[in-house]
A protein has these predicted regions:
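N-terminal leader segment of winged-helix/HTH proteins
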Residues: 1-29, 157-158
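Membrane-interacting alpha-helical segments
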Residues: 4, 60-61, 90-93, 147-158
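Hydrophobic structural patches
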Residues: 11, 39-42, 131
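Alpha-helical linker/hinge and terminal dimerization helices associated
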Residues: 11-14, 18-21, 57, 100, ...
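N-terminal helix-turn-helix DNA-binding core of bacterial DNA-binding proteins
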Residues: 16, 20-63, 146
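Charged, amphipathic alpha-helical coiled-coil/dimerization segments
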Residues: 69-132
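C-terminal regulatory/oligomerization modules of transcriptional regulators
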Residues: 121-158
Length: 158
């Protein structure tokens, strides 16, 4: 296996491990799979609009809308019309949402400690720097495909 493939496989495995743990540990909060991501970002950014939230989490608007509707129905967030633009709905956490967020943040701190165990500050800085560069690289394609574009490999014959 090439080192290039190993990088994304390792990132994927780390992400799936953390997501799986979170989904189990957040069951008592009555959060459905992956909803904690949305709630966390809404609590971090009170008043965020759904399109900005979708962009922040890197999901399509329809997926974000479903998750937001479920969070709203379950009493974790509320939507309010923006002043001067009634179409824009601002998202705010409820008291229940803030209470859940407190638990989610504690899990995040613990997961950070476990995941980064044995790494020096310099290694962590290097990892963050490299991962940001990788994200910036793929965001170009993500935005292009999101707007209906086709990446070049799709037009090549096998």
């Amino acid at each position: 296996m090439t080192k290039k493939k190993e990088v994304l496989r390792e990132i994927g495995m780390i992400a799936r491990c953390l997501d799986s743990i979170s989904n189990v540990e957040f069951q008592h909060l009555n959060l459905s799979r992956g909803q904690y991501l949305y709630l966390y970002r809404i609590c971090e950014n009170p008043g965020i609009i759904p399109n900005q939230l979708a962009e922040l989490i890197k999901v399509d608007r329809t997926t974000a809308a479903r998750a937001i509707s479920k969070l709203e129905a379950d009493g974790f967030v509320v939507k309010q019309s923006a002043m001067g633009n009634k179409k824009n709905k601002l998202l705010y956490p409820t008291d229940d949402g803030l209470e859940a967020w407190d638990f989610i943040r504690r899990e995040g701190v613990h997961s950070d400690q476990v995941t980064l165990e044995g790494l020096t500050e310099e290694e962590i800085e290097t990892a963050v720097h490299l991962l940001r560069r990788m994200r910036h690289n793929i965001e170009v394609d993500w935005k292009f495909v999101k707007k209906g574009g086709r990446r070049p490999y799709m037009d090549q014959s096998e």
